[in-house]
Amino acid sequence: MQELSAGVYHYRVWRPGSFKGVSFNGTYLVGEGQSERVLIDPPPLNAWELEHVEALGAPTLIVITNANHLRAGPELRERFGARLVVPAADAERIPAEFAGQVDGSFAPGETLAGLEVIGLADQKTPGESGLYDPARQLMILGDALIGTPGGALSLLPDAKFADPAKARAGLRVLLEREIKTLVLGDGESLQRGVRDALLSFFREVPEVELVEVEHGRGPKEGAAGWYVLNLDE
């Protein structure tokens, strides 16, 4: 288990035959001033990781970013007595045998223990959500992006989406946040160069047009930089 930054712990599980050989990742958020200890998209924890989590303080909340990332959530809910919540739009996709272990749901625009819920439209599941911590400038994603060892970002194969073009365009909202650390549910997370990696990704996305603006003169008030033109507006 790696501490990415103060109170942000990250652990990885490797599974043979997984997509492109990437790891499945879980995130644990603890720290002073945080209302809850939050475990996100947890793969199974090994004995050492369980001891580490217990030493930090058992999680009180388990957040699942999409229906396909339930993973070891129900098992860890039982072990730690934590509440488990899922995206409201994915609630019907939770397997029936686990439905009784879901304690609640959430929707875009809500806040979970200080984390802003960011709705990601037209993804693999309708409830796919990002979790943004403004204090840490930390974004946590489930299946929305995959990280490669070289620091590049990619999508799941087109076959995973009902409309791949809309799925790509649906990630535009990620450029609306200041992100210093990008934690991914699959593959390599980024602790530096996040903005550059996102811009490199979107430059290869035909559904998204980027425009560089000067301070106070862009589509949004605020600092200079790259902004997204919504092509459907």
Regions found by a protein language model. Name each.
Residues 19-22, 101-104, 122-125:
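Short solvent-exposed loop/turn micro-motifs enriched in small/polar/acidic residues
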Residues 44-112, 208, 215:
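Active-site HxH/HxHxD metal-binding segment of metal-dependent hydrolases
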Residues 10, 16-61:
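Pre-active-site segment of Zn-dependent metallo-hydrolases
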Residues 25, 106, 127-129:
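Residue-level marker for the onset of beta-strands and adjacent loop->beta junctions
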Residues 5-12, 113-118:
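Short, hydrophobic/aromatic-rich segments at coil-to-beta transitions
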Residues 15, 35-39, 45, 116, ...:
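Metallo-beta-lactamase
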Residues 2-4, 29, 107-113, 131:
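Short acidic-hydrophobic surface loop/beta-edge motif
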Residues 215-233:
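C-terminal regulatory/interaction regions
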